A protein has these predicted regions:
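A domain-level signal for the mature, folded cores of soluble proteins
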Residues: 1-203, 215-514, 521-528
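Conserved hydrophobic/aromatic beta-strand scaffold that supports enzyme active sites
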Residues: 206-208
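Short beta-strand micro-motifs enriched in acidic
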Residues: 210-214
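Alpha-helical transmembrane segments of integral membrane proteins
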Residues: 496, 503-616
């Protein structure tokens, strides 16, 4: 019997509790039976994909060999290869589709989608959503029967041996001990099962727990970070004592979104908007217009002013937590962890291919992910080589080091302040000498050129000296703050638990979900209706094209505002816009009259002000 890995006890102590959503069909599993059920393929540039290892012949030991490798080659597994179906199952495409439809119907009977996905966003997002759906017909995607086929294969594996596993890794970086829980799901059926953005074979998700050494030498949890789509940095991270971090004993609770398997801290429905970036020049124009509208005119103050692209595709992550619970106190217990030791095993470090079907999707949403160590482009993933930086923790010292780090930074500033004082003294003396020279040559015609040059040097040196003195004053203030901060830390005081979060991903509130059936129906038909009306106007009302378009746009704007409860905002914004347009029209029509009137008003004001001064 093999001795347990030394990191296993640490991983088990803080292993997460997963609360999944009712209707989800795929759960975290050991990769070994998955790989055994897959076939291995290679896609070379300009060629058709070639199967190099059939299903049932692949193992974790042979996976890293990557036969037929070459420049531009993409190796990928295929879990839903029809030739991999268990004996006794029909292998026809029609039969697979029939089983897929049956499985999807069973999922929909259990899972009921939330209300108002499209009703939560505006016309532009709905239009982009329609275009995104249309592109699925042209771009690479996972076949429609893949989810059903994957469910059948997965059920067969679970019947052989039911198990719920994670692959654990313990990384040590800059004073932090990082427990990485890699969760492998055999399939992501977000699009086909839960109205999401994509489907793809295989899904690697992760939960990180960050430990630091306490004064008594024991490792204690300080932070957690849950992977959620492509987010990274401070907004992913929560402090261990944050009320949002639900725990069962020492086990953090993770709410897993149906199909996508994104991880959240609280149950609910999360609106996820995929941004479509604009070209750089258009993005600059858009930011300028938005800044003028929000900051200069003060419109939509208090709303979501984040720096995002103007075009979003809305999707909903259903992380309800009403399904299977895996972990401490749950419906199913975790199997012993599959520890990823150091150096990493060959199946982790040697296989750089994809863990499922390579659909050749230009957006990559339908392509399977790479393993825990790599990105899809075969580069090493940041979460692997820099787990603290991935969650924005690289700038945060451990609690035991925080006060010392603040005092050390204060000493650095003190050294720089001494250097600044010396430099300021030297340049101040030089400035006084140049000032004396400038005064000496003033009024001497034969020294005019030298005088201009001296005055220029005086101005430049004075400005530089001002900047140095401003930096010294700022450093003095920062040094005082560092001393005060170190004192608070030494006294045991902590920063607010959520001070690092700039944009928390929160579930939709009850108010946001309170859409009527009429509002939902309007959201579903509005874009199509708008396009039909615009086409009809272009065909039948060419003589009144502009006026009819204005009337149509106004109708759709007011209808949308009414359904979304923003009619008052729209009326206010419309008034401001109409006032601006009216001002421009008046300026254009009566430009010279307005100029004359403005000159007369200014002259009368100056005369009145001067007469008032004489009377004092």
């Amino acid at each position: 019997m093999n001795a347990p890995h030394p990191d296993e006890a640490l991983l088990r102590r803080f292993e997460p509790v997963l609360r999944l959503t009712k209707g989800d069909r795929f759960f975290p599993m050991d990769v070994e039976p998955y790989v055994r059920a897959c076939s291995l393929w290679v896609q070379r540039p300009g060629e058709e994909p070639v199967r190099v290892v059939p299903g049932g012949k692949l193992t974790l030991e042979t996976l890293p060999q990557q036969p037929l490798d070459g420049s531009g080659a993409v190796h990928f597994l295929r879990f839903t290869d029809p030739q991999n179906q268990p004996d006794g199952e029909s292998r026809g495409v029609g039969a697979l589709r029939e089983r897929a439809v049956r499985g999807l119907r069973e999922t929909r009977e259990v899972f009921k989608a939330g209300r108002g996905r499209l009703a939560r966003v505006g016309y532009v997002s709905r239009f982009v959503d329609a275009l995104y759906s249309i592109t699925l017909l042209a771009r690479g995607r996972v076949p429609g029967e893949a989810a059903g086929s994957a469910a059948i294969t997965y059920q067969g594996l679970m019947e052989e041996r039911e198990g719920y596993s994670y692959h654990g890794r313990v990384a040590r970086q800059e004073g932090w001990t990082v427990l990485q829980y890699w969760l492998f799901y055999p399939f992501n059926d977000w699009r086909s099962g839960f109205f999401g953005a994509n489907d793809h074979e295989a899904d690697w998700e992760k939960v990180h727990v960050y430990l630091a050494q306490a004064p008594d030498g024991e490792l204690r949890p300080e932070w957690v970070a849950y992977a959620s789509h492509n987010y990274f940095g401070d907004n992913l991270r929560r402090r261990w004592d944050d009320p949002e971090v639900e725990k069962v004993g020492e086990h953090p609770v993770v709410y897993v979104a149906a199909g996508s398997h994104a991880s959240y801290y609280a149950p609910g429905e999360y609106l996820t908007e995929l941004d479509l970036p604009l070209p750089r020049r258009l993005a600059r124009i858009f930011r300028g217009m938005r800044g003028f509208w929000r900051e200069t005119l003060g419109q939509y103050v208090g709303g979501d002013a984040r720096d995002a692209a103007p075009f979003h595709i809305p999707f909903v992550d259903y992380a309800r937590g009403d399904g299977l619970v895996i972990g401490e106190g749950g419906d199913r217990a975790w199997d012993p962890p599959k520890v990823i030791s150091e150096p990493a095993p060959e199946w982790v470090s040697g296989y750089r291919g994809l863990w499922g079907l390579y659909a050749r999707d230009p957006f990559e949403g339908e392509d399977a992910p790479a393993g825990p160590m790599y990105n899809r482009d075969k580069t090493v993933a940041r979460a692997w080589y820099d787990p603290t930086g991935w969650a924005g923790l690289d700038k945060v010292p451990t609690p035991a080091e925080a006060a010392a780090a603040a005092l050390e930074r204060r000493r650095d500033l003190e050294t720089r302040r001494e250097e600044l004082r010396s430099e300021i003294g030297e340049k101040a003396a030089r400035l006084r000498k140049l000032g004396a020279e400038a005064a000496a040559v003033r009024g001497r015609s034969h020294l005019d050129a030298r005088g201009r040059e001296t005055r220029r040097r005086v101005a430049d040196l004075s400005a530089e000296l001002g900047r140095l003195r401003a930096r010294l004053a700022a450093d003095d203030a920062v040094a005082g703050s560092l001393s005060e901060y170190a004192g608070r830390l030494e006294a045991g005081e902590l920063d607010p638990a959520r001070s690092h979060i700039s944009r928390a991903h929160r579930p939709a509130s009850a108010t946001e979900l309170r859409f009527s059936r009429v509002a939902e129906a309007w959201a579903a038909v509005s874009v199509s209706l708008m396009l039909v009306i615009f086409v009809a106007i272009a065909i039948f009302e060419q003589e009144h094209l502009i006026s009819m378009l204005v009337v149509s746009i106004a109708f759709f704007a007011f209808a949308e505002a009414g359904f979304r409860g923003r009619l008052a905002n729209l009326v206010g914004s419309a008034n401001i816009g109409l006032a601006a347009v009216a001002s421009l029209v008046l300026l254009y029509e009566f430009f010279w009259q307005l100029v004359v009137a403005a000159v007369l008003v200014v002259s009368l004001y100056v005369l009145w002000d001067n007469v008032r001064e004489l009377r004092r």
